[in-house]
Amino acid sequence: VTLDVIELRDHAHDVVNNLLTGFPSPSLESAINTVVSADALIAVTPIFSTSYSGLFKSFIDVLDPNALTGKPVLIGANAGTSRHSLAIDYAIRPLFTYLHAAPVSTGVFAASGDWGHSGEDGVDASPLAERIERAARELATAILAREAVTPVLDPFDPESYLGGGRSFGHLLGGLAGE
């Protein structure tokens, strides 16, 4: 397993410049390519005012709208209190669903109170550790079960629904006995 970590704060200026110009810097392009070519994503954001951070959303905005189609995603977030935990299901999950990604069922939320729960043997015995393990198992299962994804079809191009390289005219010719 290869794990690539992308710290968005390192690309903040490049993200803004891309939004203004439409052209990514080499370092931002590398980050985008890392995300697009990944077998799966673990997307984690701090929660601000009951939603994901602006930088997180801005990075998502510079991705091609179809870049995450079918990609398994483990969603994570952190905030000061557990009151913000609903942001996973009411802000972050809908974002990835809109992009046709495949978020796993368990999201991981960490509040300040989730830290520092170790058992007698020094192993983390917190509910947070249990959520992380459950979400990781779901992500691993999604990666192993992932099949080839059907591309998103263009609703304004009837030929995109035919597949197999046949044209709409070819299909109509077959109906007419040609």
Residue map of PLM features:
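Residue-level signal for beta-strand positions within conserved beta-sheet cores that form or flank
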Residues: 1, 69, 104
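N-terminal beta1-alpha1-beta2 submodule of the flavodoxin-like/Rossmannoid cofactor-binding fold
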Residues: 1-57, 158, 162-178
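Charge-dense, low-complexity intrinsically disordered segments
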Residues: 18, 22-25, 82, 122-126, ...
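Helix-loop-strand module that forms the ligand-binding subsite of alpha/beta enzymes
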Residues: 23-100
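Residues on a specific face of well-ordered alpha-helices
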Residues: 86, 90-94, 102, 130-133, ...
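Juxtamembrane/interface motifs at transmembrane-helix termini
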Residues: 90, 96, 105, 149-151
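Glycine-rich phosphate/pyrophosphate-binding loop and the adjoining helix
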Residues: 109-178
